Amino acid sequence: MGFVKVVKNKAYFKRYQVKYKRRRQGKTDYFARKRLVVQDKNKYNTPKYRMIVRFTNKDIVCQIAYARIEGDVVICAAYAHELPRYGVKVGLTNYAAAYCTGLLLSRRLLNKFGLDEIYEGQTEIDGDEFYVEDVDGKPGAFRAFLDVGLARTTTGAKVFGAMKGAADGGLDIPHSTKRFPGYDDESGDFSAEVHRSHIFGGHVSNYMKELEEEDEEAFKRQFSQYIKHGVTADTVEEMYTKAHAAIREDPTPKKKTDFAGKTKRWNRKKMTFSQRRDRVKQKKASFLRAKQQEG
């Protein structure tokens, strides 16, 4: 079939149908969403859970959600900006931070449903593949499917770091090792040691050492926050090791405290009825005084 020019006549505009709003905005891939949301017909009202991973310039968002007609329902969420509470104060958007955020999400979710003691996940992190298995006589493992949105799913992408953290934390997420750092596409071999290095920030510490040797000014400029918080290339792995242990110890979200400070008010406070009445009396009195002085 050759090229057919679209004739934009009355019939074209009469039958024209706009795409969904979030497709027009370029925010949702509905081809992928349909497959992530639609549940098997023989499972009736059972929700199909998704592990949603999104990256901003300064944060990582991990959520467990399921779809309803009214909109998606988020049952649990974890953010990279919570990591300073667990000792990770710098590099909140790298691969190691993504792993920590995924681990925090899974431990928080299992704690919420009372499954954290049944499914502990991978306590000794080695970077190798790990799949949680159902325990006989106990509730099944919590199953979720990775939702990466519009992110590119290249080998070594950070979204898979968050997924690996959640899988090691005890969630049942179907996956393979083909997209983890350390996988060689040509030979098909997977190096768990390389992946473990990324989980503990080894790639960051290696770059810190290289940059410090080559250009100290550039090192001070790029790693200024690391220097400020006393994090060196040799202490990066220790920082993440302690963070993993702290997350497992207490994954619950921090309770919001009531605002104790004094609020600033920039506009005038609304007057009461009695205040308005007195104001009118004062204006009348001042007007009469001015008239008397003129007379």
Curated annotation (Swiss-Prot):
Coiled-coil blocks: none
User: InterPro entries under this entry?
Assistant: Rbsml_uL18_euk (IPR005485), Ribosomal_uL18_C_euk (IPR025607)
Can the keyword Ubl conjugation be found in this entry's annotation?
A: no
Its GO biological process terms?
ribosomal large subunit assembly; translation
GO CC annotation terms, alphabetical: cytosolic large ribosomal subunit; nucleus
UniProt KW keywords = Cytoplasm, Nucleus, Ribonucleoprotein, Ribosomal protein, RNA-binding, rRNA-binding
- Where is it mainly found? cytoplasm
Regions of compositional bias (Basic and acidic residues) in chain numbering: 251-261
Query: Has UniProt tagged this entry with the keyword Ion transport?
Result: no
Query: Could you state a single Gene Ontology molecular function term?
Result: 5S rRNA binding
* Region of interest (Disordered), ranges: 251-295
Where is it located?
Cytoplasm; Nucleus
User: Biased composition, Basic residues: where in the chain?
Assistant: 262-271
What does the function comment of this entry state? Component of the ribosome, a large ribonucleoprotein complex responsible for the synthesis of proteins in the cell. The small ribosomal subunit (SSU) binds messenger RNAs (mRNAs) and translates the encoded message by selecting cognate aminoacyl-transfer RNA (tRNA) molecules. The large subunit (LSU) contains the ribosomal catalytic site termed the peptidyl transferase center (PTC), which catalyzes the formation of peptide bonds, thereby polymerizing the amino acids delivered by tRNAs into a polypeptide chain.
Q: Which family does it belong to?
A: Belongs to the universal ribosomal protein uL18 family.
- Could you give the subunit structure recorded for this chain? Component of the large ribosomal subunit (LSU).
Instruction: Name the HAMAP family on file.
Output: Ribosomal_uL18_A
Protein name per Swiss-Prot or TrEMBL: Large ribosomal subunit protein uL18
Taxonomic source organism: Styela clava (Sea squirt)
